[in-house]
Design a protein with these regions (language model features):
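Conserved beta-strand scaffold positions in the cores of enzyme catalytic domains, especially
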Residues: 16, 85-87, 110, 136-138, ...
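Residues at the C-termini of beta-strands that transition into short coil/loop
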Residues: 20, 89, 140, 245-248, ...
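A short, gly/pro- and small-residue-rich
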Residues: 52-65, 85-90, 183-185, 208-210, ...
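Adenine nucleotide phosphate-binding catalytic loops in nucleotide-utilizing enzymes
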Residues: 203-204, 239-261
Length: 261
């Protein structure tokens, strides 16, 4: 990514404190990962255990001059000269909004992968298959959370020809935000299992939440051997192409006759 600080301010709907010119090429949420301070925008995220604003003094001392915050530090103009503070209502929502606007710039195939297990494995398989012929941008490691997905999508560049991103959820209501950020054109539903089941009333409820990722995709790849997955898809208003794989049904789009280990 490459945006001026003015452009970022507009994209995330922030109020800007400071007038220092800056070009932003990197987004940071973890102070331990700082590499290029002058081109970095730090999002001070809050969690139950931590508050990103506590790291502003350290990051400023290390050269960072651009921050997204929910509360502007008292005396910022004298404590942090030559800096910009972008004030927002929610720092996580601002990060997600920036990624969503960044994704809007790319009219390319994007594969969105979800499921209880196997997301990272499938992503890496696709990368190995596609990268010899295409420039592929993919999620780093297992970046599939409410923070990891926007950080992944912000890696898209003008050279990217296809994106491959994971989307993981742990509770109801999370997938819509990830869908808006990834905006997949092709969907892959790996498996449906018990991971994070404690926050859902039933496995069917979790399935319905996960398939929201595929609402606007042109095609979805899934297992027709999974009865719950099949039931959820039949109840979902999905208008794209359904490409099922099976080890039982020879009529499936992809019939697996044998598996060699």
């Amino acid at each position: 990514m490459n945006y001026t600080i003015e452009k970022v301010t507009t994209l995330i709907g922030a109020r800007r404190y400071g007038d220092k010119d800056a070009n932003i090429s990197f987004v940071l949420t973890d102070s331990r990962s700082l590499c290029f301070p002058e081109e970095t925008l730090f999002f001070a995220l809050k969690s139950e255990r931590n508050d990103g604003q506590n790291y502003i003094p350290e990051l400023y001392a290390r050269g960072v001059r651009n921050f997204v915050v929910e509360v502007v530090p008292e005396g910022w103009a004298t404590r942090y000269p030559d800096s910009n503070f972008l004030k927002v209502v929610g720092s996580l929502e601002a990060l997600q909004r920036l990624a969503e606007r960044h994704r809007d710039e790319y009219l390319i195939p994007i594969v969105g992968i979800t499921g209880s297990n196997g997301k990272t494995m499938v992503k890496e398989w696709l990368y190995q298959l596609l990268s010899p012929q295409m420039v592929v941008t993919r999620s780093p490691r297992s970046y599939n959370s409410q923070i990891g997905v926007p950080l992944s999508v912000l890696l898209l560049t003008e050279n990217t020809q296809v994106g491959v991103f994971e989307a993981g959820i742990s509770q109801p209501g999370e997938m819509m935000a990830l869908r808006d950020i990834i905006q997949p054109t092709i969907g892959v539903f790996t498996t449906l299992g018990t991971a994070h089941q404690e926050n859902f009333p039933s496995i069917e409820a979790k399935c319905h939440e996960k398939i929201k990722l595929f609402h606007d995709t042109e095609a979805i790849v899934y297992s027709s051997d999974d009865e719950v997955m099949m039931q959820c898809l039949s109840q979902y208003d999905y208008k794209g192409q359904k490409l099922d794989w099976s080890v039982k049904n020879a009529e499936a789009a992809f019939y697996i006759k044998a598996i060699e280990k």
